[in-house]
Amino acid sequence: MILRCDKMDRLFNLSQLHKNASSEDLKQGSFGIEWEGLRVRENGELSLSPHPEIFGNKLSNPYITTDFSESQIEIITPTFDTIDEAFSFFSFMSDLVNSSLDDDEFLWFQSLPCILPDSSEIPIAKYKGRELAEESMEYRKGLAKKYGLRKQLISGIHFNFSFKEELLEKLYENLDISEIESDEDSRISYKEFKNMLYLKISRNYIRYVWLIIYLTGCSVAAHDTFTPECTKLMEHSDNRGGVYSERGPSFRNASCGYKNLVHLYPSYHSVEEFTRDVQSFIDEGHLSQAKELYTQIRLKPKDPSDVLSSLRNDGIQYLEVRTLDINPFYKCGLIKKDMDFLHLFLIYTLIAEESDYENWQEEALYNEEMAAEAAYDFNMKLLKDGEEISLEEWGLRILDEIDDMCRTLGIGSRSLIDSMRQRIADPSLTYGKGLIRLIKEEGYINSQIKLSKINKITSKYLLENTDLLDDDRFKEYVPIALQGAKK
């Protein structure tokens, strides 16, 4: 069943959510974090050593593995019922990883890479021991050939989210079909209902992702060994091999970021249309497989080995938000209040009214890239249904609506929303502007290595001088995460 936007708004809106969901229902969910980051040497060069033995087999370690490169660590949390639990686990696991690296090796707390060697020397992640290993390596070789090795080293944070099944079941049971259908005998299945809910979130997230990019963006600089496609967009040199821009907060999300070679716009009106479109992209040679579709938010299936069939048969299980830059100003590269806001933002995308503007995806991509590359330009304008609007005006309007939603539903905090308002009213309070000030003073590589050292010292101190390793929340995970440790 496919519903028009106006009917979807009648199905998912603030009144319906307030009537059928408690604040506790909405505060809980299934939350997970995936964090990618490079290993670097003290001089700011990419570490070319193999994945540390202490973490064991990449394919069997569920929490610490590699992403594209052998030099690119990925931390993966299990799912938790609250953001507090997910963030605490992730922060601990980050401490564990950072403290386990050799003394002359550090995590690079930037989404854009460090000093890179010749492309031929960048090590693709090596896998062995399972049938999946060869397939994983071949897939990565294909990406390297298609997009270039340097671009593969762009790193970021993924936030996995779904509502609790109990809440979804409650919303489904209280569904008033007369709101959307004249045929009283018709009935949407539970799977269809979930799909509709997550698809509406996805559509609105894509429409408004520019706001998340502005509020959390922190990739304003690169080293000149990175791809010229990106460095040419950065108008300043730090005279130490680094380049940076004062125009926008997130070149990871900019036009030069990690994106498909051509713009691909699958339908988000139904799972059937989405999977049909993605399959056509594969058939036409734009994608090698479904997971090569790079979007700001992904529909995640029950069976990741057969994405399209599982989405059709099992429905959408959860959403993966892929927008967040690594933040160097906190020891694990992520700040919890940004996660709290992102959670509220996702709830907002469910209840926000939708527009029937035909070219909404093209417009959303324009806004995404303009916010990423030029949000600090006072004259920059976004597009809303074809009409120009300032980022400040639109952003504050959205935050007012989120504030109203939070008051009605009894979630969130006024101080959290106010802090986001302040970032819009005063760009100097954004992470990107803070990073620009640091780079002007110390240079890109020097400033980021200094932060990497501080973060490593902080992580080691916490593990050595607190009870974290014996904390009941974490201690059962340590031998699994450090499965390669010598006994």
Map each language-model feature to its residues:
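Terminal catalytic/cofactor-binding subdomain
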Residues: 2-131, 135-144, 151-155, 200
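Short conserved micro-motifs at the rims of enzyme active sites and ligand-binding pockets
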Residues: 48-51, 87, 120-121, 171-172, ...
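Extended, compositionally biased alpha-helical segments that mediate assembly or anchoring
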Residues: 414-487
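A glycine-rich phosphate-binding loop feature that marks nucleotide/adenosyl-phosphate handling sites
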Residues: 113-114, 222-229, 362-372, 418-426
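Loop-rich catalytic cores of soluble enzymes, especially ATP-dependent carboxylate-amine ligases
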Residues: 18-20, 133-149, 153, 162-313, ...
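Histidine-centered divalent-metal-coordination microenvironment in nucleic-acid enzymes
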Residues: 36, 149-164, 318-325
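Active-site-adjacent bridging/hinge elements
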Residues: 130-137, 315-323
